[in-house]
Curated annotation (Swiss-Prot):
Source species taxonomy: Bacteria, Pseudomonadati, Bacteroidota, Bacteroidia, Bacteroidales
Record keywords, A-Z: ATP-binding, Chaperone, Nucleotide-binding, Phosphoprotein, Stress response
GO molecular function terms listed in the Swiss-Prot or TrEMBL record: ATP binding; ATP-dependent protein folding chaperone; unfolded protein binding
Official protein name in the record: Chaperone protein DnaK
SUPFAM superfamilies the record matches: Actin-like ATPase domain, Heat shock protein 70kD (HSP70), C-terminal subdomain, Heat shock protein 70kD (HSP70), peptide-binding domain
Nucleotide-binding is among the record's keywords: yes
Entry function: Acts as a chaperone.
Disulphide bridges: none
Inducing stimuli: By stress conditions e.g. heat shock.
Residue segments, region Disordered: 599-643
InterPro entries, A to Z: ATPase_NBD (IPR043129), Chaperone_DnaK (IPR012725), Heat_shock_70_CS (IPR018181), HSP70_C_sf (IPR029048), HSP70_peptide-bd_sf (IPR029047), Hsp_70_fam (IPR013126)
Amino acid sequence: MGKIIGIDLGTTNSCVAVLEGNEPVVIANSEGKRTTPSIVAFVEGGERKVGDPAKRQAITNPEKTIFSIKRFMGETYDQVQKEINRVPYKVVRGDNNTPRVDIEGRLYTPQEISAMILQKMKKTAEDYLGQEVTEAVITVPAYFSDAQRQATKEAGEIAGLTVRRIVNEPTAASLAYGLDKTNKDMKIAVFDLGGGTFDISILELGDGVFEVKSTNGDTHLGGDDFDHVIIDWLAEEFEREEGVDLRKDPMALQRLKEAAEKAKIELSSTTSTEINLPYIMPVNGIPKHLVKTLTRAKFEQLADGLIQACIEPCRQSLKDAGLSTSDIDEVILVGGSTRIPAVQAIVEKFFGKAPSKGVNPDEVVAVGAAIQGGVLTGEVKDVLLLDVTPLSLGIETMGGVMTKLIESNTTIPTKKSETFTTAVDNQPSVEIHILQGERSLAKDNKSIGRFHLDGIPAAQRGVPQIEVTFDIDANGILNVSAKDKGTGKVQSIRIEASSGLSDDEVKRMKEEAAANAEADKKEKERIDKLNQADSMIFQTEKQLKDLGDKLPADKKAPIEGALNKLKEAHKAQDIAGIDAAMAELNSVFQAASQEMYNAQGGGAQGGPQADPNFGGQQAGGNAGSSNNSKDGNVTDVDFEEVK
C-alpha cells in the first residue's frame, strides 16, 4: 500500500507530512522550507508560481496573485463580500452564485486555486518519498460547514488526490500532541487560531481513544483580520495626512498587506516596530513615503475586538462539553496567530493555566494528519479518533421552522431518521430543504441543499409518511434521503451542489490540473536541458583555454564548430538542436582527446560532459554542485535564475 500523506491546507501557509517508520516527518519543499505560503500567482506567458516564488512577486503583480483563497471555499458570492473588498485580485459572481477569481477573463473556482496549492504539496511529498502519491488526509477548520468540507474534498480530487479522510484541524493537533500519551487519561482544549479561521475543541484522551466532546469557532477570524486592523490604521493615517486612500490602489494595498504582516510578526518578539514604505503613492505628482512606528500596545488596542472574540466560543465549547475550566488538564496552542502575546495572555486568563508550548503551531496539524494517514494504512495501531459534527443539521418544516435531526457536537459517523408528512391535501411531492446552523428559523440558517420527492399518491394532509434520513460519514460530509413509506419510493442527495461544482466540472478541472502538471514537468525538463547546455558550453570553453596550443588547430576547428552549433541551438532554445549539438561536441572532443592521448602516451583531457544534475537545481538552492562528483571537485558555473 502506498503512503497516505497528511496535508494542512491553511489560509496563509500549508504544510505536508508523512509517516516514516512510525514517526511523522514534516517535509521541506523545493525551497527548503517546512511550510509553503498558500499563494498562487499567474505571470506572463501563462506560467504559474506557487508558494514562496508567488509571494516574492506579489507586490509587482497584485491583481494576479491569489492568497487567502480558503476564505472563499464553499461559500456563496454574497457571503464573501467582506473578503472581496479586502483583496487586490478580482473576484466575480460565477455559476450557482459562487465566487470566481477572474484572471484575464478566465474564471477560476476557489477549489481550482486550492488544488494548485495541493499539487505543490503533493509534488513536495513525491520528491521526498521518490514515488507517486495518490492518497491524502486533508485537514479543515473544525467549524467548517458541509459545503466548505465538500469544496476541500473537491480541491483534493482536482489535484489528483484521493482524499481518504477530512479531519478537523484541532483534532489532528490533538493526535500529534497525545500520540505518546495514550496511557494517560486527560482532558485537553485545543485553541487553534490560524491565518483565516478560529477553532476551539475540547477532547478527552485515554487508552488510545481521542474523543472530541465539543467544538466551536469562527471561520472568518484569524491572522488575516489582525493584518487588516494594521492595514486600516496605516491607510487611515495616510489618508488623514495626504487625502488619499491607499486601499483603492492594488499595488499599494499589497505593499500594506506585506508590511502589516511583517509588523504583526515582529511585535510578537519586540514592543515596537517601524513600518517604512518609501514611494508608496504619488500625490499631486509628488512621491510620498509612509513611515510609522507601531507599538505592541497600539496593536493590541487595534486588535482588541478580535482577541475578545476568541473567548465566547471557548465558553460555549466548555458548556457543550459539560465541563469547567478547572477540568481542563492542558491547553494546546495551534496556528501561527497564537504567537501573539495578547492572545496567549487571554487564553491563560480564561483557562486559569499557562498554555502548553510543546508543539510547533505551524506544523502540528500536518503531523496529526499524517498520523491519521498511518491509522488508515494500519501503520499506527490502537488509536481511535472520535470526531463530532460542528453544527446542527435539519430540514425546513411548515412555517419556515428548522427542525433539527442531528444536533451539533454529535459524534460522527452518525445516522438519524425522522418521519414527516404533507402539509396540504393531495400533495404530489415534497421539497426537502436541508439546513445547517443553530437558529430556530430556517431563514437564519445556512441552506446547504434541496431536493424533491415526487410521486406521492393523492391523500389527505397528514396521511403520507415521509421518512427523512441524515447520514454523516467520517469526513463530516452529509448524505440525505427521503422515503415515501407508502410506495417505498426513495430520493437521495449527497450534499455536493452546495459547493457549486457538478461532477462533470470537477472531472474537467481535474483533467486541466493534470494537463498543467504535465506542462509544468515539460517546462522543467526544457529548463534543465538549457542549463545542461549552458554548463557544457562553459566547460568546453574552459578546457579549450586550458589546453591552449597543446591542441592542434586541425583538432580544435571541429570542436569550435560543434561548440558554435550548441551556442546557436541554446540561444534559439531548440531542444532537439541542443541534443544533437551536445552529442556532436562530445564526439569530436572525445576523438581529439583520444588522439592526444595516443600521441602523448596518456594524460589526455576528458570530454566536456554536461552535469546531468546541474539543470535540476532549484533557483536559490545549491545550484552548480554535482552530486555525481566522486572526487569532491566542484565546477563553478554561471547560470541564469529561472523560475
